[in-house]
Amino acid sequence: MKTDFVQSGGFLTIDTPFGANDLLLDGMEGAEGISELFKFNLFMRSGSSSLSASTIVGKNVTVTMEVEGGSKRYIHGIVSRFIQSGYDVDFATYQAELVPSLWLLTLSRDRKIYQTKSILDIVKAVLGEGSITFSDKTSGTYTALDYCVQYDETDFDFIARLMEHAGIFYYFTFTSSGHTMVLGDAASAHISCAGASTLRFFPRTGQTNPIDTVYRFEFEKRVALKSATVSDYDFIKPATSLSGNNAATTGSGAIYEFGTGSATASESTAKAKIRVDAAQVTSTLLRGDSFAYALNAGTSFTLSDHFISTLNALHVVRRVHHTARDDLYSNSFEAFPAASAFRPPMVTPLPRAMGSETAKVVGPSGEEIWTDQYGRIKVQFPWDRDGKGDDKSSCWIRVSQSLAGVGFGALFLPRIGQEVVVSYLNADPSRPLITGSVYNGTNTTPVKLPDHQTQSTIATWSSKQGTAGNIVRFEDKKDAEQLYFHAQKDLLTEIENALTTTVIAGAEIHTVKKGDRTVDVQTGNETHNVKGTRTLDITGDETHKNGAKFTQNVKGDFELVVDGKLTITVTGAVQIKSSADVLLDAGTSLTSKAAQALTQQAGTALTNKAGTELTNQAGTNLLNKAGVNLTNQASVQLENKGAMIVSKADAMHNVEAGAMLTLKGALTQIN
């Protein structure tokens, strides 16, 4: 095989990790475009049939195109494939595929969370991690996103869809030693094409045309989308419209897009304009063929000498297909008027989270519950390699409840350490929603299963550092049904109207193990109806206080047994009335005392009787009176004593003694 050839002097040359003349570039074919990965197929030969693919695959290679007296055009990239395609007597043939370093991002797939970063910041971060050389020529302002997720998509697809969503395009510029990804969002990002800033329209004559000419140039007009409406929903401002619209002056049709992450109506309007611009740029197409090997996608050139004067203007190259063989070169290209606002088409699909997954509730160290005013929580996904399991691991995520109204509904907040079920609104990984909780090997069920599989339970846990909590438990076991309430501390029941408790059969027991029990009827009555017996067993004192009348009605016997003293104090009158007998029985003495008058009256007979001594005493007068007979009798001695004693009878007064009658005084008068 030949080994004595050199590259110098040819239109095509190549610089590879091999020796300067180990490979000879015979031909090249490939394409580059705005917001597209360029790819060039290289056709080469070598005097060596044993070139090692590992030496060149993944390495930088530069292709140079140059004609005598012309500028150099470089195409730089990395070799993604290297093929030994054949050989003959003199040479071995090889092929290689040249791609940008950005292509390497198509090989990496990940799940990754970005918080409080704008789309442009996220794109730059991914490019930086991938060691991609880029230049930022954007001029727009990009709002920080609360939450953005790369979800089972390549790094390239992730940033591609973000840029398409935001209207950011990219293209590549080249030097002999590298290539640069240029980011843009306006016409100002399109630089003038070096070596082809002005091209002449020069129809092909069959001869080799100059390198500054376009020999075919077509103009095409299409019907494109006219208007777009973009909208979203903000739960913090649910009544606020976030809809925005934009329309072109020409075109037809309308699209409606919901769930774009807009925080304001003006953001939606801006996004609607991006959608319309992306469609409208296709309404005017310019196609051409040329020998201008310097044409570079994303750059601009001015066309001159066209017979349609309106085409002699500034245009931007959207796409170029290059073909070179030995010293021959031509290209075909697409362009659009520089006055058009280019936006990349939305071709990269949004990944869909079809279904649910679980995550762990997280928060700051030392906290057991972490939430905001809307009852949102934060989680750590098991796939998130960057999260630290703290309050920075995710955005605030809303929690689905069984009922949610204006100041009413259900509210159960998942706590730090619990495993929750995460679903996604519209299957968008960047819009998570907590829809439930699940038990696991650490967070076990509140009842032992399957032993108590008939029990349904709501059990909470005291915070902080609690060891138990409140419980509502339903036991549905046949013939052992039970509804159990446990308050870890206080149980407060507040009822706006009536409370009815009915015990069909069985007992009702109230037990206060320690503390007081108070029944406070502030307005209204209290009624107790007991068809059986009622027992009050009080170890200490009992006090009854009535602000008004107190009445007890007893149909049977009423018995009051007092082990100590019985004191009845009445500010008014006291009346004891019995249809039968009244017995006052004192073990020692019985005293009837009145501040003024004491009257004892019997319809038939009144007997005051003492086993030893009976004393009737008055401070002034003592009157014993009977309608018929009055008898004062003593078995031994009856004594009437006073400063003055008067015994008087209207008819007859009989003073009689069975043995002796003694009347004695300092002065005794019998009249």
Locate each region found by the language model:
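Short alpha-helix capping/helix-loop boundary micro-motifs
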Residues: N41-L51, Q280-F291, M346, L403-G409
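Acidic, low-complexity/disordered segments
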Residues: A297-T299, I308-A359, L433-G441, T445-S456
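Extended, domain-scale alpha-helical bundle/helix-rich regions
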Residues: S71, Y87-D88, K117-F134, G140, ...
